[in-house]
């Protein structure tokens, strides 16, 4: 078997133009170009590593062969979900981090259920996890909020200090898979409590206990709030205490955390009928004086519709000092009240499809658009899409634009620069939010790469064209006179438009490049159809073919190749082109076979937006009657060359001849050559290929057929795979195949044999039934026969004289039967029917029930006795109504309704009664 050699597209300079990659849509993926090597780089760029749709296709062209495939066979799961981190700063009164996950409508239909995992990591590497489940087919699962509580131990002790947490998330199909970190986001954590509210729980002579909360603190469905117990003691020795708490049935205590290392907190729950939570607080021994928080309590309200009816009341009972049998004083029992409100908006979030935008509209003149959605996150961790109720504006329209309805952000080509912080504002009711986009802008001027900026005429290479003739005498004609002429053709030049997308920080002067380096450029040739122009079209023209651009010389002169921005009326780049009358000659013709082309796109590790492209060419014929294309290129005396498959087919002709036509056949048209393997016994046949001018201009060179412009000889290897595996390979393959599988049970041998025998019996039975169908007339003959026997033997009183005539016809009568004699025209049938004494007819009678059966054998098998012939009516095929009309003599007639008709069916003659009665019997025809 032929082993394919995988070749990177940048490894062979001579095939840089023969192997060409294009993408569709062309603005979603780009081939990277290395400016130092003038060859395609080995990687392809896809923004964010996510396509806009699954239909992103890549096509590789090699000679006249092409191979296409999807860039992404499966949509990456992280591309089907948009995740926004809602919480930017965590405060101790609301110790949790919220993340919003939204399904991407355009990509989620290609994936199933999605699980989003989120992870918080502290500075000490402690982690907290959260997850949510998404499914676009369920209305309630198109978006979700992940709320992860932050442990109180992660908050700094000093309220004037802040600590940092990292948030990361990943996407998978199942929620039980291992977590894999994506790029992490940093979040600040602060212990400061702004606008505190103080409620006194106990106020003794030497100790006071207070409850700290935020001002105007209120609860809503599924919300969480933090309450702090503050102790102030000025005694010589601080006494222990017990704090009892009765919570509302709508509330639950999530966490109790000691905030001071000088106190030991023991939490317990009392049994019925008390239902309170006891906090036994014990200070360190001989601790004198204290003024700080000792306990943080995280309380959560249930998500019930009845939760917002009344205020929340918490009952406190503080017992100071050691326990005694005396009841505690009543002045240490306090009830605190908190208001309950409906779930309200806590944050407004902008969820874009892409965080970064490539301003290619400046180059292509086609608007670049990215969708946008606006969500609200409530205090109770509920998400709602409010895009249609929002209004958006851009901070700078020269960088980025946004639709007023917040449906999308876009770039139309009128922008002047990019930015790493292009802000978009969204307004919903009284809430306002912003989002910062990163907009990459083309670095001007662009770059144009050309295989040759000077186009010369090619010696002896004639091409034809129609030339307009001048009209004399000032006579106006409806159609101008034209003349066919041949001239030397001009060279072609391949063109690539290259761009570098960057962001420059005006304040710091830092430069960021999207391709990771300023020398790695994007090949944007496929998107400049509308902006790539020639300043003088009489000198040269630009044509696009299969995603490539080429400049074609027309007349001697100078021109400029320009990429122009119509929005701003400015030239992004220009390159001079010179078309001169200086002749160059063809110096050689190179060719190579391409039997098959395939490629693969592989991701580059740690670079999610970059992919490596590898192309495989098969240059050998591996099967009989396989066809290979011949890629040919012609070189010139000025060290330039052109692939012939890029030229117009009317410019040239190619002829090819095989040295062994029994092994290798050549099939060529005017401009294409293909070879076909015929025999494998000659492994390396030779093909001679010659290049000539077009046939229309062949006679213009010295009045004779022109000589070949270039000739080359090509070896085409034939490697037919007729090898058989060795005995060792067979044994190993058999042992692998015969080994019983865990998933498929083995079948016993006797059951297999019985199954085969049953199938054979079934086949024989079906064959017998089909053959017995040919004797269907026998059933119609025998059934009335036995019925007559039973009826005649059972009734002796009734005497009947019955004659029943039954005609039997063969299913497929041979040509020698008498029925074939009546398959001709009418005159032949009448002539044969008149001969009523044909010796080839034989009568066999069964007199038991007076049934006469007439059988017409072939003439070759009947011995006729001429002396014992008796006149009888001719027996004909009952399938023909035309022939049956001649069975009964003309004198035998029967009358029906006063009209005379010929008797064309079998007839019965019944005796008895006193007369004869002719009846029309039932016609029986056996096919």
Curated annotation (Swiss-Prot):
First and last residue of the signal peptide: 1-18
Topology within the bilayer: Single-pass type I membrane protein
PANTHER family listed in its UniProt record: DETONATOR, ISOFORM E (PTHR13388:SF11)
Primary subcellular site in the record, as a coarse category: membrane
Annotated localization: Membrane
Domain of life: Eukaryota
The species this protein was found in: Caenorhabditis elegans
InterPro entries in the cross-refs: Ig_TMEM132_5th, Ig_TMEM132_6th, TMEM132, TMEM132_M
A GO BP annotation: dopaminergic neuron differentiation
Gene Ontology CC: membrane
Null allele phenotype: Mutants exhibit striking morphological defects in the dopaminergic PDE neurons.
Disordered: annotated segments: 789-842
Keywords tagged on the record: Membrane, Signal, Transmembrane, Transmembrane helix
UniProt feature, compositional bias: Polar residues: 817-842
Tissue expression: Specifically expressed in neurons.
Gene that encodes it: tmem-132
Keyword Iron set for record: no
The protein's role, per its UniProt record: Regulates neuronal morphology via inhibition of the WAVE regulatory complex (WCR), a complex that controls F-actin cytoskeletal dynamics.
Subunit relationships: Interacts with gex-3.
UniProt protein name: Transmembrane protein 132 homolog
Keyword Membrane attributed: yes
Membrane spanning residue stretches: 749-769
